[in-house]
Amino acid sequence: MNVFDEVINATVVNNSVTGHFTTTLREELIITRTNLLSVLHKDNEGRLVLAYEWKLSGRVHGLSLVPHKSGLGRLAVLTGRGRVSIVRFDAENQTLETESLHYYDAKFEELSALTVGAAPRLEQEPAARCLLVHNGDCLAVLPLRGHEEEGEEAEEEEEHPAKRARTDADGRLVGASTVMPASHLHSDIKNVKDMRFLRGLNKSAVGVLYQPQLSWCGNEKLTRQTMKFIILSLDLDDEKSTVINMLQGLPNTLHTIIPLSNGCVLAGVNELLYVDNTGALQGAISLNAFSNSGLNTRIQDNSKLQAFFEQPLCYFATQSNGRDILLLMDEKARMYNVIIEAEGRLLTTFNCVQLPIVNEIFKRNMMPTSICGNMNLETGSLFIGFQSGDAMHVRLNNLKSSLEHKGTVSETLETDEDYMELYGNNAEKEKKNLETESPFDIECLDRLLNIGPVTSLAVGKASSIEHTVAKLANPNKDELSIVATSGNGTGSHLTILENTIVPTVQQALKFISVTQIWNLKIKGKDKYLVTTDSSQTRSDIYSIDRDFKPFKAADFRKNDTTVSTAVTGGGKRIVQVTSKGVHLFDINFKRMMTMNFDFEVVHVCIKDPFLLLTNSKGDIKIYELEPKHKKKFVKTVLPDALKEIIITFGVILESNMCNKYINGLEKSEEPQLLFTFVTADNQIVFFTKDHNDRIFQLNGIDDFRQKLFISTYQLPEDINPDPSIKQVIISRLGHKHKQEYLTILTFGGEVYLYRKCIDNPDRFIKCDHELLITGAPENAYPKGVQGVERVAHYIEDYNGYSVIFITGTVPYIIIKEDNSVPRIFPFANITLVSMTRWGENSVMCVDDVKNARIMTLNLDRDRYYGNKMSLAKIYLEDPLEDFQTLNNITYHERTQTFIVSYAKSIDYVALSEEDEPLVGYNPDKIHAMGFQSGIILLSPKSWEIIDKIEYGKNSLINDMRTMMIQLNSNTKRRREYLVVGNTYVRDEDIGGTGSFYLYDITEVVPEPGKPDTNYKFKDIFQEDIRGTVSTVCEISGRFMISQSSKAMVRDIQEDNSVVPVAFLDMPVFITDAKSFGNLMIIGDSMQGFSFLGFDAEPYRMLTLGKSVSKLETMCVEFLVNNGDVYFLVTDRNNLMHVLKYAPDEPNSLSGQRLVHCTSFNLHSTNTCMRLIKKNDEFGKVSRGFGIYMPSFQCIGSQADGTIFKVVPLSEASYRSLYLIQQQLIDKEVQLCGLNPRMERLENPFYQMGHILRPMLDFTVLKRFATLSIPTRMTMASKAGRQAHAEIWRDLIDIEYSLTSLNKIT
């Protein structure tokens, strides 16, 4: 009974294509990040701007943009093990519409003798005649028709009348699929490595790289080279294939086919081969010293490159001036240029050179995943995604000169032009020295932040490490942050995940009496600060430029509550509105006019030169400042229909959404002033100054429908006053590129966001991008709106961003990055009563204890606000050393420091168990890569390195944790120590060895000028042991060290020596271990995991239960729910399993067999899990006699940058949410036609779990909050009569489970 939620969306870009999908006006970039599909466009400066984004239910393995005669392509999306969705952009609803859905995975499993792979591939035929899906030795061909011109269609229909009848019958854009094993194409095809369509042929042709007899370097001398390449011509109508040619005896390291204009390149780890479209091997390039020299063709020796092209290979191919230009990127993001030039069938140029990039732009990037763009000799623009490092949009500045230079180099390599020799009859090996390449300049135009792969997590103080900021309490006091190790190689870094926004405090003030503040700017400078205290009915003025001294103004209404005040009249007048009147002053507060009212003013909007008042009776008044002398306000005539309407809120907005209904402005895009009002029956109405008694309304807003549109207002026959809309703002949100949004704040604290359609300014579409739930209807979440009133404030320039603040007990900020959707974050960890703009790009905020802080948006350390939590990157830099990969992190609570382990790559040193060089070791040969590890002590105040310890060569730290170790068995005294588990990486024929280290962190005298360097590592104990150390774990005041397959518990003595006290043997190899009190779970690499108990009197480890399934365990963690013990286990197949210790169940054999509850598909590899406390948003849970039972939840990380949480649920909550999830899946239209239930639960373990109690998906459940009110009520009624409010409470409790990080308990 748990729910899964992604608290950080995936950041690794795994697919990208360019083309026209949503508009024909500009080329678009379409990318996927696991299950996130984004459409972006490029501005004039090359920055990426998000146009649309959708979160899909499954992982996307491939993308292809299919041409269509409408001009807008259809997007083919490959998910699962072989599911293709063909979708188009629905401009009316701003969403994806599925045109065709094809499930091949079941057929693949039927045809395949082996388990179908989890990473299928999607290919489009160059002439867009068909799509090819292949997974292992199975393939499916899907004919396409949507791109064909009318003449082509008629010709094909004459030749194939059956096809014409089938097309006319269903009107589909695709034909009938053909699914077959690869051996159907040719009987010899087996163990397919790659399959691609070839270019430059009249008919569809496919190249297949396969290895009928598997071979590797260990048996290569016996099997020889068994790789084969075959070119087949396909007849899509008759489902036949014809062999064009077959090549045998190719190197076993080949893995990728790269189609070119008149041939293809076969890329391998050690060589590149060029094969023309007739199947003739015309040339080869050796890339390193391990390349195959026995090929029957001309070989160009480029072994000095020492390049290794591992799979998967990232490449970009284009054509210029009759030459094929191929850009390759290896695992370390080094770029290589391959030029292929031919005269007819005669290959004249085939050369590979490494491009010397002068600005080291890819220094922090590794493992490219996708590349797309456009490139010609004048300019080149590419988008490159990386597994490690930010995705980058780059410009190749001096491409033309670089390619011209490389052309000269390739010509010097031509020594023989004999035709037969080039075709391999008398091939010879040719060796030439390469000329030096000219510097290659690449300019980064924009980046998409990537924090993957995330390898380790720790929870500790980062933003709250300082108790005071600017002499006031830290606005992020008591907050804990999640700090993760991210990335590989030089680009590895720490990522800080903040649950709230961490502002930069510039100045602080202390007030005695204030409930609301205003900043009056005179001539562009902050001049006056006006405050009011409604409890004491008093207002004051302070002179800002005189260090906030009180300003004496005799005419100012001090003994009254100020509702609003602002500068008007072009900066020459100041207006003060109190609860009983309006007062007009000059800029020195000399009175010019006063208007007194016999009603109470409750809301005011001042927008030069207009003044809008809303009174307590629901009436409005609008005044305009007399334009000539600006000495009085003139009443504006209102439409007659307003007399029949009860108004709850009024505001003056600027927008062009009503222009098409206004005479003379039908084609204008200029924004107009709109007097906007919210009625008691939750309608939003507008009118202009010259209204002619014409009022407009926003249809559908009363039910918060998905689409809103403008129309002429018609007074309803019956008005049922039930106000729920509190405030309305139409504003432009963003950074460099701002977009117009409609923001609605309700009395229940809910925030709804609608985006204005670009093509139809009179229409708005609801944003359903997993926005943070801030409130609930029916008073289901009173905590959110009690105490301090929630008020929305639009800030046009908040350190460059246009944002919306919402004050209250829990304040929020709505912010949008240019390349992301809008996000809602809690703002700091304090209550905000009032706020006002300040300076150029800051705000002044007043909290509930009268403290005022001037704050601006924190943009330090690559801080990013485009994901579901605030992210910041910390690069650990040392001028003398590159730490490379950071792989583990832990937090030392006593000293409030973080410890990070690193593993840097070195040349492998072949040493024996006695640390002597192995017999036959030759230091002059090319080395394999080894590791050398160490640990770093960091201060979160400055993230500077305090202390460092480096271990010997071949060392690799697999795990380290801080633990409370018992020092004395009599006094039970404990101390926090650091335990480090280290393994020595050696040859496979040498027994594994390791070591563990015990450290204390002690306080020392800091270095001069470096107050943070006041802690150092203190060595307590260390020991070399037999067996590799893969994990360490605390257990009941002792610590467990894994030694290959043995778990050894050790105890520390009073003299700081360490002795083993208990052990347990596991079947194969220990991968992970976690403890909870005196209970422990230990995961095995092949045989699942065991549930153990530890007893100290006498010392022993008791096996309480084992998993029945033989899981290939990756990570394990406890999940405790209301006294019940559950286990979370992830395996190598990207599955998360939930098991339970239930000795009372009859099939558990008194608990010896752990009960399998459910299995849940993860879309990426899990790397780490941690148990943390759960926040109970609606009160603490007690269990008998008033005993408080703390709640827990699990957080985890994945290789694609995702951070997730698993939250346990009560029985009642699970039942109602399960019903809602079923309704959402069955009743709502799913993107790309994907079934969320199938994408998450379809796996081999489905039948083993409780089918009616699967793990819930919060991504699906959260859609409930974005539904229209009638749809929500209908769904909630299925769960019970009073279930609507309970469902909202359950959603909020899950949403705010991580708020436990904001509280020190």
Swiss-Prot record:
<dbReference type="InterPro" id="IPR018846">
    <property type="entry name" value="Beta-prop_RSE1/DDB1/CPSF1_1st"/>
</dbReference>
<dbReference type="InterPro" id="IPR004871">
    <property type="entry name" value="Cleavage/polyA-sp_fac_asu_C"/>
</dbReference>
<dbReference type="Pfam" id="PF03178">
    <property type="entry name" value="CPSF_A"/>
</dbReference>
<keyword id="KW-0694">RNA-binding</keyword>
<comment type="function">
    <text>RNA-binding component of the cleavage and polyadenylation factor (CPF) complex, which plays a key role in polyadenylation-dependent pre-mRNA 3'-end formation and cooperates with cleavage factors including the CFIA complex and NAB4/CFIB. Involved in poly(A) site recognition. May be involved in coupling transcription termination and mRNA 3'-end formation.</text>
</comment>
<dbReference type="Pfam" id="PF10433">
    <property type="entry name" value="Beta-prop_RSE1_1st"/>
</dbReference>
<feature type="region of interest" description="Disordered">
    <location>
        <begin position="147"/>
        <end position="166"/>
    </location>
</feature>
<dbReference type="InterPro" id="IPR050358">
    <property type="entry name" value="RSE1/DDB1/CFT1/CPSF1"/>
</dbReference>
<dbReference type="Pfam" id="PF23726">
    <property type="entry name" value="Beta-prop_RSE1_2nd"/>
</dbReference>
<dbReference type="GO" id="GO:0005634">
    <property type="term" value="C:nucleus"/>
</dbReference>
<protein>
    <recommendedName>
        <fullName>Protein CFT1</fullName>
    </recommendedName>
</protein>
<dbReference type="GO" id="GO:0003723">
    <property type="term" value="F:RNA binding"/>
</dbReference>
<comment type="similarity">
    <text>Belongs to the CFT1 family.</text>
</comment>
<keyword id="KW-0507">mRNA processing</keyword>
<keyword id="KW-0539">Nucleus</keyword>
<feature type="compositionally biased region" description="Acidic residues">
    <location>
        <begin position="149"/>
        <end position="159"/>
    </location>
</feature>
<dbReference type="InterPro" id="IPR015943">
    <property type="entry name" value="WD40/YVTN_repeat-like_dom_sf"/>
</dbReference>
<dbReference type="InterPro" id="IPR036322">
    <property type="entry name" value="WD40_repeat_dom_sf"/>
</dbReference>
<dbReference type="GO" id="GO:0005847">
    <property type="term" value="C:mRNA cleavage and polyadenylation specificity factor complex"/>
</dbReference>
<dbReference type="GO" id="GO:0006397">
    <property type="term" value="P:mRNA processing"/>
</dbReference>
<dbReference type="GO" id="GO:0006369">
    <property type="term" value="P:termination of RNA polymerase II transcription"/>
</dbReference>
